[in-house]
Amino acid sequence: MANILKTIIENDKGEIRRLEKMADKVFKYEDQMAALTDDQLKAKTVEFKERYQNGESLDSLLYEAFAVVREGAKRVLGLFPYKVQVMGGIVLHHGDVPEMRTGEGKTLTATMPVYLNALSGKGVHVVTVNEYLSERDATEMGELYSWLGLSVGINLATKSPMEKKEAYECDITYSTNSEIGFDYLRDNMVVRAENMVQRPLNYALVDEVDSILIDEARTPLIVSGANAVETSQLYHMADHYVKSLNKDDYIIDVQSKTIGLSDSGIDRAESYFKLENLYDIENVALTHFIDNALRANYIMLLDIDYVVSEEQEILIVDQFTGRTMEGRRYSDGLHQAIEAKEGVPIQDETKTSASITYQNLFRMYKKLSGMTGTGKTEEEEFREIYNIRVIPIPTNRPVQRIDHSDLLYASIESKFKAVVEDVKARYQKGQPVLVGTVAVETSDYISKKLVAAGVPHEVLNAKNHYREAQIIMNAGQRGAVTIATNMAGRGTDIKLGEGVRELGGLCVIGTERHESRRIDNQLRGRSGRQGDPGESQFYLSLEDDLMKRFGSERLKGIFERLNMSEEAIESRMLTRQVEAAQKRVEGNNYDTRKQVLQYDDVMREQREIIYAQRYDVITADRDLAPEIQSMIKRTIERVVDGHARAKQDEKLEAILNFAKYNLLPEDSITMEDLSGLSDKAIKEELFQRSLKVYDSQVSKLRDEEAVKEFQKVLILRVVDNKWTDHIDALDQLRNAVGLRGYAQNNPVVEYQAEGFRMFNDMIGSIEFDVTRLMMKAQIHEQERPQAERHISTTATRNIAAHQASMPEDLDLSQIGRNELCPCGSGKKFKNCHGKRQ
């Protein structure tokens, strides 16, 4: 282990030396750029663009381009990037993460790689965690970019599609991570190319990259529509049952935060819901409601995991920032279960139309980089998942903050008593204090204690985050006391007021350790910016979540033997033990995120295929007849091959039914037409006849443009419907294969194999529906604005009719389980009408 650490440190030192040499080359242009007039300096942008278009690489332009930005920043912003900022900019251009401490000027650092990469004309996305930071940075740094001749756009959730498109067309676009993700998903749901807002994803520079790519990595962005099934009553019933349970009726795993019914709980469920066996296959849906009710009531905590707004809505609290996540809802029914628990209106369940995780969204960029002050602890994950390194950048001035050893108390009560005494003492001498908490509940509790102690203060948490920037900006003033959840105003510097340096600078007090060392380091990093003095102190108790999860029993015995109920233990060894516990949690969380990615990669591969084909259809300015006719041909082949092993009479009858109900006019084909033909000849006969029907169908449309429109909308509507169902099916499959792990099967391998088979089935089903709708749609001449509505409703009506289109006199008992269903769904019999037998 020591050798590994030594190697890592040596590699970092070597990288720093290399970056220093590159920064020196930038500095060599300093006098040359300073000698230019404003117009001459601005003209450099046009020169660089021309050189790039003529084949020169961005790497070769780096030194001059960075020098231009430095000089431009000095003239426009009154800021002149330091050497360490230039070094950080080089790391960003190379697609890595520079770890730069709080207050080292990351926003100014970003201007150099952003400018350089914008010269390509392919677009640069500067990604922030909230819209306040997007607007602030776009306004402040946009002044520099505009002066240098580059266009700057801000992409906000409130903007119209046209405004969004204009923002994305700019050389540099500022946006939040969630809005980029939702725009990507919505772009892949439109029917016309002109309604897409994004260009191909080129270069993303992510601010607070650890928050977005690590903390929110598992968060799926979901575009959804309403589910047709009414389920609110079931949520209320499950909630009522769960609230009636005793502690012996369920089992909670504190470490993994999972919960399940005990034997007595199962007995009570069977009695409550009047069931013989709770885990019978027909009760799968009910067990899902019960599982969610258990999680909602005994795992999810009010004012920690979520808050109830004044509008009686459940708002999720981000565990890493403490902010409420507006517009976000827990998936898979958990949100509705919490609504039932809290007695607020239950909103309709939704069906996912499109989804993507941040892991897969940002891996789609040609180049990805980001900035953070605390990335080294997650270097393995950055490297393994995103193929980017974390390079620690030296501070411009030495860090003077004093980080005290942790203080450990026996109880939460004695811990908070000590916190209040410490805050009061510092307040009385005028030293500003920032108290960091992990939950809204804790910040409210400390606030009440400080009020009782006569200490005026500000509270910053999920309930009043709209005042975040204002509160944080004043947190470094003399006598200021600020209580903040983990959000702690990331992105907003705390500047020290007059006379505060002499008092020791800002003191950061942590009220418990987070499960991630990185979050603790972020809190510490609020103090001691740019060489300022400062202090940090963490107060812990044996009753804290982290301590309970990892061995507080032994320490509890020490407190009892020494009779130290009100006193603290302080030692470096204790701090190391806590950090070792945090490493174990971080390792568990990383393993979980890695497994999520393995599952999500299955959907990623399938999504890329569907979206690529969809894009090809949307952007096609051609007759799509070859594509549709190929689908018709493959559909015919699947149906004929699917009945190859049946008896001749049964086979011909099934193929005839398929042709009548899905392919040709009912009275245009008879059994005699198919008798005596080989399977190959049947395929050819049906295909040739279908081509005539196809020509007849398109001849009813007004002109060539109407044909293209009809073809395009037809394909897209079928693809979108099938893809939505497929997403839902994959989600159900994922839940199902988890249980197969108990049978010694690898659930990920099972998911990959089954998901691949389901995808192929979906492709067949898409081609079947396109065939049937193309051949059976009742086409009328329509004006263009109405054409989309017409085909959409026709498709919906035909799909509904198709689901019931089984000939009444057909003997289903003679059909093999793996043969295609004769109803024409394109599914195997066992997965269609065979389910009902």
Curated annotation (Swiss-Prot):
GO molecular function, one term: protein-exporting ATPase activity
Cofactor stoichiometry and binding remark: May bind 1 zinc ion per subunit.
Cofactor: Zn(2+)
Alphabetized InterPro entries for the sequence: Helicase_ATP-bd, Helicase_C-like, P-loop_NTPase, SEC_C_motif, SecA, SecA_CS, SecA_DEAD, SecA_motor_DEAD
Keyword hit for Protein transport: yes
Protein keywords: ATP-binding, Cell membrane, Cytoplasm, Membrane, Metal-binding, Nucleotide-binding, Protein transport, Translocase, Translocation, Transport, Zinc
Residues that hold ATP according to the record: 85, 103-107, 493
GO biological process assignments: intracellular protein transmembrane transport; protein import; protein targeting; protein transport by the Sec complex
Keyword Protease belongs to the record: no
Residues holding Zn(2+): 821, 823, 832-833
UniProt cross-references to Gene3D superfamilies, sorted A to Z: Helical scaffold and wing domains of SecA, P-loop containing nucleotide triphosphate hydrolases, SecA, preprotein cross-linking domain
Described purpose of this protein according to its UniProt entry: Part of the Sec protein translocase complex. Interacts with the SecYEG preprotein conducting channel. Has a central role in coupling the hydrolysis of ATP to the transfer of proteins into and across the cell membrane, serving as an ATP-driven molecular motor driving the stepwise translocation of polypeptide chains across the membrane.
Subunit text: Monomer and homodimer. Part of the essential Sec protein translocation apparatus which comprises SecA, SecYEG and auxiliary proteins SecDF. Other proteins may also be involved.
HAMAP family registered for this protein in UniProt: SecA (MF_01382)
Matches recorded under PANTHER family: CHLOROPLAST PROTEIN-TRANSPORTING ATPASE, SECA INNER MEMBRANE COMPONENT OF SEC PROTEIN SECRETION SYSTEM
Protein family: Belongs to the SecA family.
Protein name: Protein translocase subunit SecA 1
Organism this protein belongs to: Streptococcus pneumoniae serotype 4 (strain ATCC BAA-334 / TIGR4)
Species lineage: Bacteria, Bacillati, Bacillota, Bacilli, Lactobacillales
